[in-house]
Amino acid sequence: MAGLFPDHPEAIENTAKIAAMCRYDFTFGEIKLPRYRPENGMAPGAYLEKLTYDGLDARIQNGTVVLDTEYPLEVYRERIRYELSVIGQMGYAEYYLIVWDFVHHAKEVGIPVGPGRGSGCGSLVAFLIGITDIDSLRFDLLFERFLNPERVSMPDFDIDFCYNRRDEAIAYVREKYGEDHTAQIITFGTLA
């Protein structure tokens, strides 16, 4: 910095003063999620299960889940039981509900939401509750790429909102869950 601003030694001094005033202790290895409390008073895990089975029924009715000999109802139910078990065991029912909440809200107010991408598309539960629109059974996608007991880092859903209404979706999350529980993360790809 001294090389960039040789005529302004106060810039270096002021930068050092600002750095000295900054104090934040990061707690690594701890996940800090807001709480999701279903309005109906159900426990989060039970509510996620209800949404999942309601979603299965709705998707069968609207034709986005087609039951046949390769994928009968019991195959869907078995996968649901497995996923809900892992989600519950790892303590992520509220995480699913938070993502469901803001995706559901966006769709309700007409904000276009992408169909899903990344490893989150491997979750049948995510499909059935409307976080994604990709049937992981039909496309042989692995739930374990998204969430498994050996995974040490928190999973994340890649959610795409329409660029000109994205701010509305983010404002909803900030308002409902608080500024201190809201962040935006983006990766920029380059050809370099």
Describe every region a protein language model picked out.
Residues 1-192:
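Phosphodiester-processing cores and adjacent nucleic acid-binding clamps
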